[in-house]
């Protein structure tokens, strides 16, 4: 019997674990962006985040010195470079984690229904823990917004 992995997660005990700062997130984001539907969703979420931050955009610009384009970093698996700076890595890792959750949802995995026995995050991985908890509370990734 050949059972799709995410189908098994929907019915078997499992844990979700999310990595943090050392994650080569630009590479993961580039991989996710190769899927046109996922790329559109990620750009939509990034734009929504920018809209929420608009009231403090001048302060953010004063801190970073320039706008941060999360999709503009080189996808290098060996070196993060400028993508390691907190002004890029915090939103970049969060967006990439959201991308993983969106991709899993498109493949039929819903943590609200699958009920993982644990959701763990190391360092910035805790952001995805909060995303997963929001999905569980809302019932689906779509309802969580």
PLM features: residue spans?
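FabD-like malonyl-/acyl-CoA
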Residues: 2-145
């Amino acid at each position: 019997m050949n059972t799709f992995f995410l189908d098994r997660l929907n019915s078997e005990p499992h844990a979700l674990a999310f990595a943090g700062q050392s994650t080569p997130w630009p590479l993961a984001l580039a991989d996710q962006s190769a899927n046109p539907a996922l790329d559109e969703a990620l750009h939509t979420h990034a734009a929504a985040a920018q809209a929420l931050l608009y009231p403090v955009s001048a302060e953010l610009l004063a801190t970073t010195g320039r706008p941060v384009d999360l999709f503009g970093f080189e996808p290098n698996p060996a070196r993060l470079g400028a993508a390691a700076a907190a002004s890029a890595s915090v939103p970049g890792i969060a967006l990439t984690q959201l991308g993983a959750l969106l991709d899993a949802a498109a493949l039929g995995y819903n943590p609200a229904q699958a009920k993982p026995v644990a959701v763990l995050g190391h360092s910035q991985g805790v952001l995805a823990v909060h995303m997963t908890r929001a999905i569980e509370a809302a019932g689906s990734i779509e309802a969580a917004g």
